[in-house]
């Protein structure tokens, strides 16, 4: 048995927006009973979604799958305005689990468009957060995913241009794209503060701190989790083999051959119980000690919708 050491990234796992979104579903189930409909996976984590489904949540992709008169929850990623309008038209009871930091971007987009600006959204095509943000306005918004896309944007007036970003991007990739936009459109304006959220930034920074100290990195998170995929990429860009695993069963023993120090982190939608199970699995595979690295403390919390708050 080799004597491996596990290093735990700090911070890792749940962020305030994810905790709030899960709590909204759980409180709605407690108040109103099953079924509670949720448009899209409330957060991108299989374990969390399966757990809520077992409690009576029904996950749908479109509102026409929600029967009239029922309760629907919008996922943490946010929704286009058309979805809100449809829910209102149909008289559905709505609880909005959109992360407040995503809502902030929605408000920025609406304000920029009202000012007569066209908008460039930096993000991943097809991601629900991007669809929700771009769906805040009827027109005048362009998506860029890679630097090459910047050359292909056609705008009416380069003097009247603004940008926003998806909240879960790679911090470094986003900076590269912003630089490319500024080079082509010197007058482009952006939000006062970067749209990439505190949790995305902190978790990427924690991996940057951990990666030089380990021989392999495991990121606990689901394949469809944008921020979890970015954590894996951050480690790989620093030259460390990195694997995205949904749970302990996803670990292949061969990945640990000749590895003395094993780094573990978790995406913002992955619960600590999965990290604990990964640590136990690594102990079975030869790890004998666990150490949590120092990191930035997080004290952010977001309140629930008033109707779901429990009295103190």
Swiss-Prot record:
Its EC number is 1.17.7.4. Its cofactor is [4Fe-4S] cluster. (2E)-4-hydroxy-3-methylbut-2-enyl diphosphate binds at residues 44, 77, 127, 167, 225-227, 269. Binds 1 [4Fe-4S] cluster per subunit. The active site is at 129 (proton donor). It is an enzyme of class 1 (oxidoreductase). It catalyses: isopentenyl diphosphate + 2 oxidized [2Fe-2S]-[ferredoxin] + H2O = (2E)-4-hydroxy-3-methylbut-2-enyl diphosphate + 2 reduced [2Fe-2S]-[ferredoxin] + 2 H(+); dimethylallyl diphosphate + 2 oxidized [2Fe-2S]-[ferredoxin] + H2O = (2E)-4-hydroxy-3-methylbut-2-enyl diphosphate + 2 reduced [2Fe-2S]-[ferredoxin] + 2 H(+). InterPro entries: LytB/IspH (IPR003451). [4Fe-4S] cluster binds at residues 15, 99, 197. GO terms for biological process: dimethylallyl diphosphate biosynthetic process; isopentenyl diphosphate biosynthetic process, methylerythritol 4-phosphate pathway; terpenoid biosynthetic process. Pathway: Isoprenoid biosynthesis; dimethylallyl diphosphate biosynthesis; dimethylallyl diphosphate from (2E)-4-hydroxy-3-methylbutenyl diphosphate: step 1/1; Isoprenoid biosynthesis; isopentenyl diphosphate biosynthesis via DXP pathway; isopentenyl diphosphate from 1-deoxy-D-xylulose 5-phosphate: step 6/6. It comes from the Bacteria. Isopentenyl diphosphate binds at residues 44, 77, 127, 225-227, 269. Keywords: 4Fe-4S, Iron, Iron-sulfur, Isoprene biosynthesis, Metal-binding, Oxidoreductase. Dimethylallyl diphosphate binds at residues 44, 77, 127, 225-227, 269. PANTHER family: 4-HYDROXY-3-METHYLBUT-2-ENYL DIPHOSPHATE REDUCTASE (PTHR30426:SF0). Catalyzes the conversion of 1-hydroxy-2-methyl-2-(E)-butenyl 4-diphosphate (HMBPP) into a mixture of isopentenyl diphosphate (IPP) and dimethylallyl diphosphate (DMAPP). Acts in the terminal step of the DOXP/MEP pathway for isoprenoid precursor biosynthesis. This is 4-hydroxy-3-methylbut-2-enyl diphosphate reductase.
